[in-house]
Amino acid sequence: MAASAPQTVGFAISGPIARADLPGLCVRVCALLERTAAGVALCDVSGIVSDAVTVDALARLQLAARRHGCQVRLRRASNELLDLLAFMGLRDVLPD
């Protein structure tokens, strides 16, 4: 018997992200993961600014998702964001 594919949920992050936004962002995404029990979360990052705070936010979301048995996968990431993730050593942590 083949294992079924994990349930997928999607969400988007937009705008510049301030450090003060990180706790609320994590709370909202964790609530979504708890409601859906998804195994994969597709995060549309096409509307974000590629900077260190954004990478910090994405890394925190991945950690929170893993605590819920989920994996965040990036969607519509810019080359600039992918390059920054690679530079910071997090490219494998946040797959697309």
PLM regions: where:
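STAS-like cytosolic regulatory interaction modules
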Residues: 1-53, 60-96
